[in-house]
């Protein structure tokens, strides 16, 4: 999914198919706003860069999940060596690998 205007309008049908996945580290921060007032009420700020961002809900669910992803599932039809998988991360033996994000409630 490509973002062009930095806005995604949520609807009851938006998650009928599946999770929305935004790749290529396009997202650093996501906020949910109240439709009626425009007031911010929750968000996620990526402190480190994440390769992908998942946005999902059960169809007609009373919530929206905002998830920074440091990796993700295979693309449909991917049959290559795991080292060729997009978004793959590797830590050397003894190395510590961390990513940080903040959950913001307002």
Language model regions located:
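Sterically constrained small-residue positions within well-ordered secondary structures
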Residues: 23, 46, 57, 90-92
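Short Pro-Gly-centered flexible turn/kink motifs
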Residues: 89-106
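Glycine-rich active-site loops that engage anionic ligands at enzyme catalytic sites
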Residues: 33-74, 79
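Active-site/ligand-binding surface loops and adjacent short beta/alpha elements
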Residues: 1-47
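Context-gated lysine
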Residues: 2, 35, 60, 85, ...
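Short alpha-helix capping/helix-loop boundary micro-motifs
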Residues: 81-88
